[in-house]
Amino acid sequence: MAHDAETSVVKFKNQDFRTLRDHCLSRGQLFIDDTFPAAASSIGEKLLRGKHLSKLEWKRPTSKDLPFYPPHFILEGASRFDIHQGIAGDCWFLAALGSLTQNPQCLQKILMDQSYSHQYAGIFQFRFWQCGQWVEVVIDDQLPVIGDNFLFVHPRGGNKEFWPCLMEKAYAKLLGSYSQLHYGYLPDALVDLTGGVVTIINLHSSPFDLLTTVKTAIQAGSMVACATENGLTEEAKVMENGLVSQHAYTVTGAEKIQYQGRWEDIIRLWNPWGKTEWKGRWKDGSKEWRETHDPRKSQLYENKEDGEFWMSCQDFQENFSCLFICNQIPITMDHGVTPNESWRQMRFTNQVISRNRAGGHGRDMQYVFSVQEHTAGNNVVVAFTIMPQSLNTEEERFPLQFQVFKVPQFQNVQGRLPPAFFSPFRSAAQGTKYVSKCNFTKSFHLNPGTYVVVTTANGKEVEFLLRIFLKMPDKHRDPSSNFNLRALKESLPENGSRNSISYTYMDQGLDIDATQLQSLLNQEFLTGPPGDTFSLDQCQSIMALMDLKVNGRLDQEEFARLRSRLIHCQHIFQSIQRRPGVLLSSDLWKVIENTDFLVGIFISSELLSLMALRYSDSSGRVSFPTLVCFLIRLETMAKAFRNLSKDGKGIYLTETEWMNLVMYS
């Protein structure tokens, strides 16, 4: 049955970390894991072909004859640069892991609190998510080496950090052997590390704003990764442009950068190999980096052979096939990434379906859900996750298939729907799907009504988890959990700092469009965790109100005028807010009263009440970006009336004049 209970933790192979560690400590022994022995069987034949098996040894990082002695579990924080891929083709797992390092809080949940310096007994534990529950995997720290070289993931340079090596071993144990890591699906690793749901974007066919998508997704704590297409062979090969075919990369950032008097979108990637980088535009040491005068250059760029590099977003979309975004809720792409959307989840765990030998829907399983109200874009995501034990390594197709049908409005669903319901004339709902080895996800836009998910098995008995995500209308959003007001930075002085980002752009006389304005405002005026930032829609609105030339851009003079108002709004917000980041709609009259650029503007109590409804959330709170939009619009509309009125009492406009005024503002 469906439930929303707290996810449980299961001991893999019934091994309890504390019991085993304490037993070893009491006897002065180092743990030896008989369930995943230091033997060729734990590696697998596929990865041992052609290797010098006579020289293969298993050593602990504490061995003094290794160049990494003394070892550390983590030293000065976990980073993607601690990872260096070995002979296994597990870039799909390491790219996901590299992305997870950008969210230290989530990473700590699976790394646990352990070290080589405190209560060391040769035993370590890690957590992975499988079919609705966290699985705790215990390993010993014996790692396969040939000479001084680790066969699989090994520490980079001289940092002596072994958390990536040990975590890779734990994941290999969970899947059965190191060979099971050799080629896999990036979405499966993202789900196994987080328990989230993956949104897959086809870079060749999806019209979307790549820069905004990546920046917003990362700010929302999402894991973001990508993959190149297959080459001419089954093996991953380095291409002439420096990219690797059939290879996974971590997406670590995206920026809009100034170059030759214009703006260019660039994206930053990391290669789990720890080397081998892009050789095209914006590569390390490129003329683009030498010639750019962007003030953030020193913050963004460092010429190092560490596997991380920048490339233009245009080159990225031409050379990569898919972008993968993993979050605890679906990320819909209909109107850009909106991480504050509210979703409800129905979860069906430990589901078992037997093989359907008779065909049709006679042995199917059915799950009913309802869509209550109209919402924009994709509003239902159906996600199946298969238990690894149910997978057949020889079978390429997914072991389940499913469809979603709408139940007629007046048909009462009690128990199973009969086979007659699924006539050849009843069409299934159409959605966007993605299938990997362990996960099958479909996204739908469904009208209000009752629906049934019908699934059948393709082969043997299958155990699975089903999650149905339902988007809630904005009014159902829980403000305490889904709405984080972002804190304002300390007030900027009226004359500004010559080192501020916006002043640098003003000095260079560059025009700014709405996307650039969004980036500047969020960097200069807001700080703290992701939450209510200046959205692109708000910046387009501000742009229209301040754009005197009506060309869709702000010149130096227009931006300077906007900046002075923003600083004044900042002072007002901070002086009237009830607590950091929270201004109540009931205090809007105080705001208007204290806003210098609104002097002489009259606003009735009736209009003030309407504005409180228009610009506050369901809890009566007004964010700083929303307040800015309100105050600038109020000033602009009042000035427009005065300019158009001949007697100060009223105005006469043609339909065209009226439409021009209200539609571009």
From Swiss-Prot:
Calpain catalytic domain sequence ranges: 30-329
SMART domains the record matches: CysPc (SM00230)
Annotated disulfide bonds: none
Pfam family, one: Calpain_III
Enzyme Commission code(s) on record: 3.4.22.-
Catalytic machinery residues: C91, H247, N271
Biological process annotations from GO: proteolysis
UniProt keyword annotation of Metal-binding present: no
SUPFAM superfamilies on file: Calpain large subunit, middle domain (domain III) (SSF49758), Cysteine proteinases (SSF54001), EF-hand (SSF47473)
Enzyme class: hydrolase
Annotated coiled-coil segments of the chain: none
Entry keyword annotation includes Repeat: yes
Listed GO MF terms: calcium ion binding; calcium-dependent cysteine-type endopeptidase activity
Family: Belongs to the peptidase C2 family.
Function, as annotated: Probable non-lysosomal thiol-protease.
UniProt-recorded name of the protein: Calpain-13
Lineage: Eukaryota, Metazoa, Chordata, Craniata, Vertebrata
